[in-house]
Amino acid sequence: MARAVGIDLGTTNSCVSVLEGGEPTVIANAEGSRTTPSIVAFARNGEVLVGEVAKRQAVTNPDRTIRSVKREIGTDWFVDIDDKKYTPQEISARTLMKLKRDAEAYLGEQITDAVITVPAYFNDGQRQATKEAGEIAGFNVLRIVNEPTAAALAYGLDKGSKEQTVLVFDLGGGTFDVSLLELAEGVIEVKSTSGDNLLGGDDWDQRIIDHLVKTFNGEHGIDLAQDKMAMQRLKEAAEKAKIELSAAATSNINLPYITAGAAGPLHLDVTITRAEFQRMTQDLLDRCKGPFEQAVKDAGIKVGDVEHVILVGGSTRMPAVTELVKQLTGRDPNKGVNPDEVVAVGAALQAGVLKGEVKDVLLLDVTPLSLGIETKGGIFTKLIERNTTIPTKRSEVFTTADDNQPSVLIQVFQGEREIAAYNKKLGTFELTGLPPAPRGMPQIEVTFDIDANGIVNVHAKDTGTGKEQKMTVTAGSSLPKEDIERMRRDAEEHAEEDKQRREEAETRNVAEALQWQTEKFLAESGDKLPTESRDQINEALGELRSALGGQDIEKIKSAHAQLAQVSQQAGSQLYTQQQGEQAGATGDQAGAQAGGPDDVVDAEIVDEDKGKK
């Protein structure tokens, strides 16, 4: 049976895990790290760079490096590279393809099935877009799972049959969620979830960046915000300082040659204390309180009844965040999970559940936001309340607002505001062909169906005529199937190009290594070779040098093979010659040793005898 992986597609970093012998294993990437930066860059030569290599070149290539794209997924945002528009789905797919390649290299087999996680507070459009990103990357997306739910699954699977209440506090690079769950006998039931999709570690970084820009402007009168390359350096320095301040009381940010002024190059040297950092980010910390209180209220659970608190996301390592969680819950967070990996581990376990590898586990998730339609007066009429367990299906009967109304426009919204326009519009469709009738007479049954991925389907039916209309709700950002297929092919072509580039680079490296070894061999032992062999090597070496000066990879391969052959022959000749010389020398030495000692001994005896006489 084909393996399935679990993927935490994060704002800042992503992680992939797989079940091995029933136990989840986090897969290290090609660079040896267990997490991969969610950064994609387009090099000038057309190569697509992902992860650590993309991060390393960001300073010199800021316009063509994309990070934190997860914040844009499910919107109409795009980035223009070389006159081609890339959607958030396509950029996210590049990260997913990198994870897929690394997983396949580790497992030694092709991977198609995956469970991908999303923030619990993602709306329908964001979930759809994440699923599309997976499809573009070549995955069959088995399930979209909420990150806190995956974390609870990873935490709670081995906790036995005792019923317990768990709070998951998930503060990642770009999003924030709080979820309350109940665990008992393999059943993981989400009671409530709340969050903020625009709050995360990136915002803490931005406060440091703003502080550095303001400080530098005050000292030198130069606005670094106008310099893209300088801003990329500030971004990296801010992230590093934030991490340092989690362990140290101060962090020194020293960036030489950050820009140039009238008198020459200028340097940035600023020290930030932890207290100063916490002051400038206090309002961000305060924003964490609202979703926490909402989740507790919706669950109908007292804070004192929470038995375990799990921290998820790298941003929870900040001391101020840990302290806030202690204040809000009255208990120390659980230290037994890795906040960077626990979500991917949970996703792998859910993949195992869906594949039948993990038994006796039932995951009951909820929809994070209420769903409904717009009714007369612009009112938002809810059909499914937030925190309803999914999958679920609800129906309600509506009627017409005007006499002889020939059609009904169904506008679907997601949110909590009473006025429809203030909520997130998911889509619109029309039920046509209604027979003439006084207003209030037609009976229009509207049914909402949410699947286990949290993706919505809507169905409207005129009970009088039997006419009906169905739609899978797709936000304005969602892509038609043919676009997903086109993007998938495009991504595969890029992957093939990248593979070819890697192979070409490896061929060139191997050829250059042989060239160097052969030159060294000639310098050290060339005078010991027959003239004919030496001439053959020099001729083949010249061919390889010439090939390496061009771009024809086949020519390099051919020249490499020829040089390898003649070098090997010459090496064998030299080895045989040296063995013969060594054997002759050993024979002479053995003869000398056989006669020499006897002569010496005889002489000594004679001398002794003479002395005695």
Swiss-Prot record:
Keyword GTP-binding part of the UniProt annotation: no
Biased amino acid composition, Low complexity: 577-598
Summary of the function given for this chain in its UniProt record: Acts as a chaperone.
Induction line: By stress conditions e.g. heat shock.
Residues passing through the membrane, by range: none
Disulfide bonding pattern of the chain: none
Gene: dnaK
Organism of provenance: Salinispora tropica (strain ATCC BAA-916 / DSM 44818 / JCM 13857 / NBRC 105044 / CNB-440)
UniProt-recorded Gene Ontology molecular function terms: ATP binding; ATP-dependent protein folding chaperone; unfolded protein binding
Protein name: Chaperone protein DnaK
Family: Belongs to the heat shock protein 70 family.
PANTHER family, per database record: HEAT SHOCK PROTEIN 70KDA (PTHR19375)
Biased composition (Polar residues): 567-576
